[in-house]
Amino acid sequence: MKSWKRAVAVALCAASLLAGCGVQSGNVSNDDSTDEPQQITIEQLRAANDQRSLLEKHDTVTVTMQESDQNDTVTYTAKFQYTCIVDEVLAWYHYQYTENSDAGEDEVWGEANEKMYAERSASDDAASLSIHFRHDDKQYILDMMPQCPTSGENAEQTIDGCSEENGAILLSVTTRYLDSSGYYYTTCYRVDPATSELLEMSVTNYHEDENGAVSKQGIRLYRWSYDEPYQAERNVMNEVLFSTDSTEDVCDLTYFYPAPGSEKGWDVGENGWSVSEIRVAHGTRILFLDSADLALYADRELTKPIDFYDGVDTSGESATVYIVPLEKNH
């Protein structure tokens, strides 16, 4: 792997972040002789770092990430970037897994727009293309990007401390799940005091056994930067999709989906179907996603089911698929 420079840089900034956050939980001493540090609440932090809000203020958002195990051995690093161009959210990511990860040494690249995203790994000759029909296409992409974590249900959060260091606010928060059998995590935020935007964040997972002994389970480190040029490290979409006038030896994929209004009996699209045609590289794994589970068929009469996990066969010259949300599949 050639990610050691990035790993070292992230580790150095993480050491500073963790040292600033200090304690793991609970006990923070207050020195009355010092100025009161600027305060920020979790609610303010989440609102300021809402991804849509960030895109209203910045051309791009870039996040680097590193995960280490309980022995502080790096398991992977990653980089993400997202932007909004003419009201369309675009994003890409690149994971670099080390030999210490569960998957072993590998690399994964991905690109996404509001209709689909493509992904491929160094260990697999075939790429994958996910086509989605969700109502909020922007949020679907943004959910793939690192963000300020929420507590979730059945969780209890404790503010461990808030201080200032080197012109930034440092906030430490511990989250315990009420039914987690001793598992919890501490999040340390480094925040720009002028904008309340995240600069760095660490998330450390712990486990406390029945005797009160605490062990670290692993740590994820994040670093945010803003307004860098948007540039994917690999154009995966171009490796998967081809123009309609392309002379490449590819598969012509036609897919049908119930058009809006067809559930009311309206004659919309082609007999109630909307139809799309794309050209994909041979062997591309095709996945269709919706807010509901889907059934796939090879014929208009819906008599020839396609196994959802086997997917559509794109090894030939053409392929056709009819996509039916299960609640509409009678």
Which functions belong to the PLM regions below?
Residues 131-202:
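Extended beta-strand-rich segments in extracellular/periplasmic secretory proteins, especially
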Residues 240, 318-330:
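Conserved "repeat-terminator" motif of extracellular CCP/Sushi domains
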Residues 12-17:
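Hydrophobic core
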Residues 39-40, 46-50, 153-155, 194-254:
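Non-transmembrane domains of secretory- and envelope-associated proteins
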Residues 1-8:
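Bacterial N-terminal signal peptides that target proteins for export
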